[in-house]
Amino acid sequence: MKKTFVSAAQLEQIAAQYPTPFHIYDEQGIRENARRLNAAFSWNPRFREYFAVKATPTPAIMKVLQEEGCGCDCSSLTELMMAERIGCVGEHIVFSSNETPAEDYRLAAKLGAVINLDDLTHVDFLERAIGYIPKKIGCRFNPGGTFSLGETREGFQVMDNPGDAKYGMTRAQIAEAFRLLKAKGAEEFGIHAFLASNTLSNEYYPALARMLFRLAAELQQETGCHITFIDLSGGVGIPYRPDEPANDIAVIGEGVRRAYEEILVPAGMGDVALYTELGRFMLAPYGHLVTRAIHAKHIYKEYIGTDACACDLMRPAMYGSYHHITVMGKEDAPCDHKYDIVGGLCENNDKFAVDRMLPGIDIGDLLVIHDAGAHGLAMGYNYNGKLRCAEVLLQPDGSTRLIRRAETPEDYFATMVWDD
């Protein structure tokens, strides 16, 4: 059974201060998780986690992770601007994007970010955009075919078939890119790859590492390029369902270390730095979407209507994803009622849960939707004129602070051009 990081009584007090719906994050949990990750890879002296800003683009959260030694993985102009705003610059930023506008490359270069190129044609595009090729640069690899550990767990559906993915370069293209970049002045090279999403296996990172380590050794020998970093990107997942096993980051780190010792060290590459770009793993379990039951509807099914909707958490509507739900104050009550938990959008897929067995829900009950700390508010939108909700940080001393206010109608109308 999943546990909330706030009690029912505590949450009622918080909800009295910040009207529902809102996202709330557990600062202590975020910090402890970041420390576990850093410990798991401490054998690599230059290891750094670059938090995937796209997962939770909130400055206060980025700052917490920065204090724990993390950099920022940015993929757009505004994400770069947020990183700069919190004082994250230089090699503390990795810029991994695709179909990248020239303006984005210019800001990444200005900030001194480590740029990962997604395509061979971007070598010349980048040079035209900024006027030079950076001394340190990476390229994204796509091996094609399929990438599988022989498992069929929820979460592999997003990118377990690299051959169908729009990202990265082929083996021949990445070798050509390295040679071209070297001729244009690059001195330090890196390899990046992202091949699966939300993996629930301690073997994903080690398997990816073995692939990239072999590629790095081959490319350094073939091209003469000095490879100084390998970016494992993201993909380490979290168990959304209570009965799913969690990844053990210490076991994962040890598996990567063994691959490093077996492949890179004998190749004379024992100084290569490892990077990760985790988002979901860093944040998802440490964020709740808090909503209140405001309606009960009894037709062909039993519905509980909430004051949140898919605009606040779109994963269930978009992907059919499971998010666990706790009825606060009824944690120990029997789950003997079958409900669809829904929002108020004019779309029938606006459902947080379908045929979910839960305790009996009364109007006014607070519901916690678990694992909403990543790709929650970040994927929010304004369909039906809905306004994005607030974000609250639960601090280690039990106090709370507002880290993003709720949108207002004035925000919604701000970009509109009226005829009157």
What positions do the PLM features span?
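A charged N-terminal "starter" segment
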Residues: 1-136, 181-187, 221, 226, ...
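General structural feature for long, well-ordered alpha-helical segments within catalytic domains
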Residues: 10, 26-29, 33, 37, ...
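Conserved, mostly hydrophobic/aromatic
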Residues: 30, 54, 76, 108, ...
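Active-site-proximal loop/turn and secondary-structure-junction residues that shape catalytic pockets
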Residues: 55-57, 78, 99-101, 119-121, ...
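Structured core elements
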Residues: 71, 94, 116, 138-140, ...
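Glycine-rich, aromatic-flanked loop segments that form ligand/cofactor-binding clefts
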Residues: 131-148
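Active-site loop/helix belt of alpha/beta enzymes
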Residues: 144-294, 358
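Charged (often Lys/Glu-rich) extended helix/loop segments that serve as interaction or gating elements
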Residues: 261-264, 269-420
